[in-house]
């Protein structure tokens, strides 16, 4: 067993079953090891930004990390934009970056670079393995770090000689570091605050927008009438008919300010206070009303789902929310295509429990309006604002949930960044329908 084989077997032992790869010479022993160690599915990507974006989509849908395999510092640099998006989404990823052999670094060959320096802004954990015998334990720690609440990018730098030299054995999975528990005192205090008659908003993010978390939020709304909101680019939300309705915060700062006007208490569940996406002259960046009190039920690293359930119980809320989104399908339009008619077609024809990898950008408003009451679905938006994510996100989502339809509504500009994802979709025979909007907002003329 060499270092690469011990690495792959350790990843498999730790529950990692998919690797999005754009390898080069330094990673060839990893590639060769894929033929001898079973259990890790390699997915070839023609560009590193596709690999990192696909790992994000996979992690958001599967709830567990995929691995990436990137070639040296420049390869990592090519993938940084979508690692930025994944960091903002708190997606678990094991980011394996090959490097020159340890003894070769002293010669400063052309591709030598500061890999850790590239990785630092997007990683929650970084480590350079020192030898083949250390690879397995380092990989187990990387998976543990990626899985640690709320989820993060663990970058493991793999020198070529650590991959090809003999290793002893694979490592087993380390215990997960789960979310911190919200104290009973915090639950009690917030239950009292929610009974004070003030105009209250609850801002949800993360697992509070899916499954049991969303249901618990609905119970609280049924009891107190609290307004349920989510971030503009909440990374993973369950939306549509039969679901608890949650309002999405709009994009522009002045719209956010108008939406929140009069709010006296804002309760955060895995979220941060809303701010303007960009700064504009004479426009506020901070969108929370001046006299609004900010209250944290759960920080991102804390168990927001259990906190919501405990808060619902403390309030004496009903066991189920009485408010559900009704199904409303718009029918098929006639006439020419525009952002509204395309949104109507998508909402009408997409089946139940589809996954939307959404980078429709400037065409998004009609689509979000149509999807709000469409068939139940999962919505994965551009979580970090760096365009060129939608197509790779769809690749990862389709591999994580092969039994579900994936739809990728995408602006033309961002799609041009990572169009290589279409090749991976075809090669892997993925069930993805891609709709490219001719937004033409840039209107660049050469």
What does each model-identified segment do?
Residues 42-45, 92-96, 118-122, 128-129, ...:
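A glycine-rich helix N-cap at a beta->alpha junction
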Residues 21-24, 43-53, 68-75, 130-131, ...:
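Active-site nucleophile and cofactor-binding loops and adjacent substrate-binding regions
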Residues 4-8, 12-17, 22-25, 30-34, ...:
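Active-site diphosphate/adenylate-binding microenvironment
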Residues 17-18, 60-97, 120-172, 190-200, ...:
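Structural signature of the thiamine diphosphate
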Residues 96, 104-113, 223, 366-445:
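Thiamine diphosphate
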Residues 60, 206-297, 374-404, 416-420:
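Glycine-rich, anion-gripping cofactor-binding loops and their flanking helix/strand elements
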Residues 133, 157, 169, 270-364, ...:
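Phosphate/pyrophosphate-binding active-site segments
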């Amino acid at each position: 067993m060499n270092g690469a084989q011990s690495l792959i077997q350790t990843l498999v032992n730790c529950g990692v079953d998919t690797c999005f790869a754009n390898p080069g010479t330094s990673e060839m022993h990893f590639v060769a090891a894929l033929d001898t160690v079973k259990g890790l599915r390699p997915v070839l990507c023609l560009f590193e930004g596709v690999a990192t974006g696909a790992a994000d989509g996979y992690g958001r849908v599967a709830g567990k990390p995929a691995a990436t395999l990137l070639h040296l510092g420049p390869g990592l640099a090519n993938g940084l934009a979508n690692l930025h998006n994944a960091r903002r989404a708190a997606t678990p990823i094991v980011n394996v970056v090959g490097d020159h052999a340890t003894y070769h670094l002293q010669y400063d060959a052309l591709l030598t670079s500061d890999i850790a320096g590239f990785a630092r802004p997007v990683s929650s954990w970084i480590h350079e393995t020192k030898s083949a015998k250390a690879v397995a334990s380092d990989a187990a720690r990387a998976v543990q770090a990626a899985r640690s609440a709320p989820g993060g990018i663990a970058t493991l730098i793999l020198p070529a000689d650590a991959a090809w030299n003999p290793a002893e054995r694979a490592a087993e999975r380390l215990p997960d570091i789960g979310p911190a528990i919200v104290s009973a005192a915090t639950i009690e205090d917030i239950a009292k605050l929610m009974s004070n008659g003030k105009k209250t908003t609850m801002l949800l993010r993360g697992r509070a927008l899916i499954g049991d978390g969303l249901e618990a939020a609905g119970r609280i709304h049924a009891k107190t009438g609290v307004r349920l909101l989510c971030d503009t680019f909440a990374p993973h939300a369950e939306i549509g008919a039969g679901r608890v309705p949650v309002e999405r915060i709009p994009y522009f700062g002045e719209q956010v300010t108008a939406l929140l006007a009069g709010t006296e208490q804002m309760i955060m569940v895995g979220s941060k206070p809303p701010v303007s996406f960009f700064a504009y002259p004479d426009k506020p960046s901070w969108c929370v009303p001046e006299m609004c009190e900010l209250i944290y039920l759960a920080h991102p690293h804390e168990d927001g789902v259990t906190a919501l359930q405990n808060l619902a119980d403390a309030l004496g809320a009903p066991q189920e929310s009485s408010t559900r989104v009704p199904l409303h399908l718009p029918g098929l339009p006639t006439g020419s295509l525009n952002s509204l008619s395309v949104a109507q077609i998508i909402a009408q024809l997409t089946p139940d429990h589809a996954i939307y990898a959404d980078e429709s950008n400037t065409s998004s408003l009609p689509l979000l309006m149509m999807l709000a009451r469409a068939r139940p679905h999962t919505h994965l938006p551009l979580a970090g604002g760096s365009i060129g994510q939608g197509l790779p996100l769809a690749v990862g989502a389709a591999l994580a949930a092969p039994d579900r339809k994936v739809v990728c509504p995408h602006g033309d500009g961002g799609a041009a960044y990572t169009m290589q994802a279409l090749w991976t979709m075809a090669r892997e025979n993925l069930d993805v329908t891609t709709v490219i909007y001719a937004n033409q907002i840039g209107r660049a003329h050469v």
